[in-house]
Amino acid sequence: MRGTLATALLLVISSRVATESNQLDPQQLSNHVVGTYDKIYTKSSPRRFLRGSRKQRDDLAPTAADENRTINNAIESAMHGITFSGGTTAATRNAAREVVDINAFSKRPRLSLNVPPSETSAHLIEAPTFPQRNSASTSTTSDIATSSSRTSNQRTPKTQASLDMSHKTMTRKSSSKNQFKKSTALKSTKRKVRARKIPAFVVNKVYTLYFDHVKTKSLGFDPTVKETKAMLSLYFESSVDPFYVSAVLSNFFRYFDDKELTIHKKKLGTTLTSALSTLAALELPPGMLKEIERPFVWYASLKRWRVMYCDFFEFVKVNSDKITNSLPNKEFYRGETSDIVRDKLLATLKKETNTNTRYKRKRKLKNDLDDVLKKYNVKEEIGAAIRDLGEQFLKADRQTIPSRRPTRRPGASHIQPSNQRTDLTPHGLQVPGPEKNSYQHIKSKDHARKKRPRSSS
């Protein structure tokens, strides 16, 4: 009789819990359940489904009202079938309480994997594939022992830890794989040929030889070690497309501090010195005066840089053997450069003198001056004086390296002498001898065929 009563109580409570589990609202599901167009499926085991949300576990547990109602129903059913004394009623009440207490803990829900889609299924939001584990269940040792028969097929903590570790490994591999693909895509856009890193002993030796060359010929400009390194780097980079001279100078000039700027101003001739003296007479703030001087020094340095640019490559070509023999590692230099490389470098310099490139330099100088004037908010008359000084520098911008024109017949008297080029640079430096013919081999063959010979008379 008692076995029949216990079986009836278990069937009643199990049926009620199973019914409530199958009637869950999709909006109240935890983040382990994902709603699709035609089904609802769980991403993990039912035990992990209940463990992921404490609120969900509390919703599935019977409330106090359900517990009292179940106990009363069980007692009424037992009273109809039991004819013993009142002591049996107390035993039945205790047995019912024990059954309710057992079912109050986490229980595996019976979710249907093929539930038809409802109106609220579209509002479900997919959660992360592997959410983090929450705190463990609050069941006691006796409760776990009581329900061990129902949880024998669940994952142990050791198994779950190994699964989590394997997931982290897979995630790390997938992320590293994506990073590898991204870096490969970036590498494909970079230049395939890279310039060699020049050791310090090579730079110092080339600088010593080139400085003696400049001093012997009295060219008027004395290069620094940094400038020699920049030109030497550009020389070794000749296997790829060379940079513009102005771009190399801008990148090199960016790292000038105030001390280097003061030393550099002494190498740029009297034109810049008089302009800077005019700026100093305006009584500008010290910070503004330094910022105003920098664009002018850059512009004047570009003219000096062009002359030194061509002369350096001529020096390297002529003194290639001397440079190679003076280095401890003779294999580094690899001998002299071919005429093709030299032509490419000089052709790049020729682009610096075209109309479009000169217009960009003029615009850059004006923009730099305007930025400084706006920053310090100077008076209109001071700003006008600084802009006029900038216009004087722009008018002096002309082709530094003169190209030799075809010789004309004596009868061509309509050409004005003022249009002829001189061999002097804008800052008063004599152009080196080899540079006067720098563009002779770059001229097109069509232009050479149009050259008329002199008359025999």
From Swiss-Prot:
Known glycosylation sites:
68
Instruction: Say yes or no: keyword Secreted present.
Output: yes
GO CC list = extracellular region; host cell nucleus
Bias regions of kind Low complexity — which residues?
135-152
Q: Where is this chain compositionally biased, Polar residues type?
A: 153-163, 176-187
Q: Where is the composition biased (Basic residues)?
A: 442-457
Locations listed in the record = Secreted; Host nucleus
Any idea what job this protein has?
A: Secreted effector that completely suppresses the host cell death induced by cell death-inducing proteins.
By sequence similarity, the record places it as follows: Belongs to the RxLR effector family.
Recorded protein name is Secreted RxLR effector protein 8
Write down the species.
Plasmopara viticola (Downy mildew of grapevine)
